[in-house]
Regions:
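Glycan-association/targeting regions that enable binding to alpha-glucans and other polysaccharides
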Residues: 5-172
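Positively charged n-region of N-terminal signal peptides that target proteins for export
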Residues: 1-3
Length: 172
């Protein structure tokens, strides 16, 4: 039991900025033993790209060249017919190059932001804050990577509809 818990805690994807570079180091620790995996990634909703990486020590490391103005990177890996996509949510990270910032991110986070905006709009208080929250959510939804025909695509589209609906309720 403890071994399974340790695997669940330590397996997954970690992302780091390389020193003095906008490029990213992606480190994967697979849930099952394997010698090779395919890493899929998408910056800010661009087409998915992939790279095959081999095990070096305990980890699989890949360096991804960051585009000029990335907002978000989505990552998942495939190995031995197993898809590691963070339980269908992808591994998402919000990126800023200046100053450097790398923060885990999820559609659940956006959902929480939209709920907060809805509360402010319904209470008719702090409408300016609600507008800021909706602007942020709208921007992130426009660039968040997703796998076509996946539950995440449906969830993303549903959140976008909610943002548009809330914008229509704002009385300026």
């Amino acid at each position: 039991m403890n071994l399974l818990l340790a695997i669940a805690i330590f397996a997954g994807v970690d992302v780091y900025f390389l020193k003095d570079s906008p490029d990213l180091l992606v480190r994967v620790l697979p849930e099952i033993q394997t010698e090779q995996l395919t890493l899929y990634y998408s910056f800010s909703g661009q087409d998915w790209d992939s790279t095959v990486i081999e095990k070096e020590g305990r980890f699989f490391d890949a360096v991804l060249q960051s585009p000029d103005m990335p907002s978000i990177v989505g990552i998942y890996s495939v190995y031995d017919d197993y898809v590691d996509d963070n339980s269908g949510n992808l591994y998402l990270y919000e990126l800023k190059l200046f100053p450097k910032m790398l923060m885990p991110f999820s559609l659940t986070d956006l959902e929480t932001i939209i709920i907060q905006a809805r509360k402010k709009i319904m209470a008719r208080i702090h409408i300016d804050e609600a507008i800021t929250l909706l602007d942020y959510a709208d921007h992130m939804l426009s660039v968040v990577p997703y796998i076509k025909n996946s539950p995440n695509e449906l969830r993303k589209n549903t959140l976008q509809i909610e943002v548009n609906k809330l914008r229509g309720q704002i009385v300026r």
